Swiss-Prot record:
Record function comment: Transfers a GMP moiety from GTP to Mo-molybdopterin (Mo-MPT) cofactor (Moco or molybdenum cofactor) to form Mo-molybdopterin guanine dinucleotide (Mo-MGD) cofactor.
Protein name according to UniProt: Probable molybdenum cofactor guanylyltransferase
Keywords: Cytoplasm, GTP-binding, Magnesium, Metal-binding, Molybdenum cofactor biosynthesis, Nucleotide-binding, Transferase
Family annotation (Gene3D superfamilies): Spore Coat Polysaccharide Biosynthesis Protein SpsA, Chain A (3.90.550.10)
Domain of life: Archaea
Gene: mobA
Cross-referenced PANTHER family: MOLYBDENUM COFACTOR GUANYLYLTRANSFERASE (PTHR19136:SF81)
Domain characteristics, as noted in the entry: The N-terminal domain determines nucleotide recognition and specific binding, while the C-terminal domain determines the specific binding to the target protein.
Species of origin: Thermococcus kodakarensis (strain ATCC BAA-918 / JCM 12380 / KOD1) (Pyrococcus kodakaraensis (strain KOD1))
Class of this enzyme: transferase
Primary residence: cytoplasm
């Protein structure tokens, strides 16, 4: 299973390239990659980039593919699935739980559905922490042609399997945390070094 990291966003709310912002001396994106590398079900990692940041991302040591569409999450997922089945996450999710990723991939393999997506009790989906079949790409292609870029709607109208989040270990929920603003960085205490516990730089 490919681990696809969507890393083509512009980070407008953050005020700069948040994926390269350093936390305890290490780029935010690297935390996401390292957590994904710890998942036993992930065989290789691919970074889905924009044309603008593709060269910078090659420094992270993984294959980089360019999202030519730049229509949001759907375009990134569509691009990733050109390479095969993929577990897709956003690059700004530094608290990924490897065991949770493995759990989702196992459910995906068992269910044999086009997608396997975590779902909250209120119906809210987590499409950027989910497993997708390469066959789902054909379904997305029709959406893209009609300019319907709503990924949650596409998932709901496909024959997806869902993982009920409230039935899982509560500690796994931190896996969904993503950094949108600089204020969000204050929640990243687990990533600070022991020697520099109060420094985010």
């Amino acid at each position: 299973m490919i681990g696809a990291v969507l890393a083509g966003g512009r980070g407008r709310r953050f005020g700069g390239d948040k994926l390269l912002f350093r936390i305890s001396g290490k780029p935010l994106l690297l935390y996401t990659i390292e957590r994904l590398e710890q998942a036993e079900k992930i065989d290789e990692i691919v970074l889905v980039a924009s044309k603008e940041n593709a060269e910078k991302l090659r420094d992270f040591g993984h294959d980089v593919v360019v999202d030519e569409l730049m229509i949001g999450p759907m375009g990134g997922i569509f691009t990733a699935l050109s390479l095969g089945d993929a577990f897709v996450v956003a690059g700004d999710m530094p608290l990924l739980v490897p065991e949770f990723i493995d759990f989702i991939v196992e459910r995906f393999e068992e269910a044999k559905k086009p997608a396997c997506v975590p779902r909250w009790s209120n119906g809210y989906l987590e499409p950027l922490h989910a497993a997708y079949s390469s066959s789902f790409r054909d379904f997305l292609e029709e959406r893209i042609k009609s300019r319907n870029y709503a990924i949650n709607q596409a998932i709901r109208e496909s024959d997806a399997c869902y993982i009920e989040i409230e039935k899982l270990p509560e500690g796994w929920r931190e896996s969904f945390f993503n950094v949108n603003t600089r204020e969000d960085l204050r929640r990243l205490t687990p990533l600070r070094t022991r020697d520099n516990p109060d420094t985010l730089r």
